[in-house]
Amino acid sequence: METVFDINEIMKILPHRYPFLLVDRIVEHVPGERIVGIKNVTINEPFFQGHFPGHPIMPGVLIVEAMAQVGGILAYMASDDEVRNKVCYFASIDNVKFRKPVLPGDQLRIEVAATGCKRGIWCFSAKAIVKGKVTTQAELKATFADKDRL
């Protein structure tokens, strides 16, 4: 699997840092259309200490956050220089479905497709996949804003 953006390039785009940076690399990117990110889920993730002891499962909200981060990279890369000085914020989540748990040792493949952009609001369709099976799917919206505006 070829790496399009490595972790260093991702950290130049996203403001998130450990333990909240939830994408390790980008392996596919069609500018303004779609993107695929990878998150390697290890037992060392801090959330596994409490979710759940003896039966670790990646929290669904963090899977959705990983989708949003990958979508944010897609929107950022398709935007002009003015937007690149701003931060991409989550605007909404719709039609989320959790189909299968994500466990330590899984490699999460996050596929995000842009479905539109109106008045600065990006719309995405996203899927998280492990071993070829969809674990989570959602429709997301995001927008860019000045860091000090919110």
Swiss-Prot record:
Keywords: Cytoplasm, Lipid A biosynthesis, Lipid biosynthesis, Lipid metabolism, Lyase. GO terms for molecular function: (3R)-hydroxyacyl-[acyl-carrier-protein] dehydratase activity. One of its GO terms (biological process) is fatty acid biosynthetic process. Coiled coil: none annotated. It is found in: Cytoplasm. The active site is at H51. Pfam families: FabA (PF07977). Its main location: cytoplasm. It catalyses: a (3R)-hydroxyacyl-[ACP] = a (2E)-enoyl-[ACP] + H2O. It comes from the Bacteria. Signal peptide: none annotated. InterPro entries: FabA_FabZ, FabZ, HotDog_dom_sf. One of its GO terms (cellular component) is membrane. Its EC number is 4.2.1.59. PANTHER family: 3-HYDROXYACYL-[ACYL-CARRIER-PROTEIN] DEHYDRATASE (PTHR30272:SF1). Involved in unsaturated fatty acids biosynthesis. Catalyzes the dehydration of short chain beta-hydroxyacyl-ACPs and long chain saturated and unsaturated beta-hydroxyacyl-ACPs. Belongs to the thioester dehydratase family. FabZ subfamily. HAMAP family: FabZ. This is 3-hydroxyacyl-[acyl-carrier-protein] dehydratase FabZ. It comes from Geobacter metallireducens (strain ATCC 53774 / DSM 7210 / GS-15). The lineage of its organism: Bacteria, Pseudomonadati, Thermodesulfobacteriota, Desulfuromonadia, Geobacterales. The gene is fabZ.
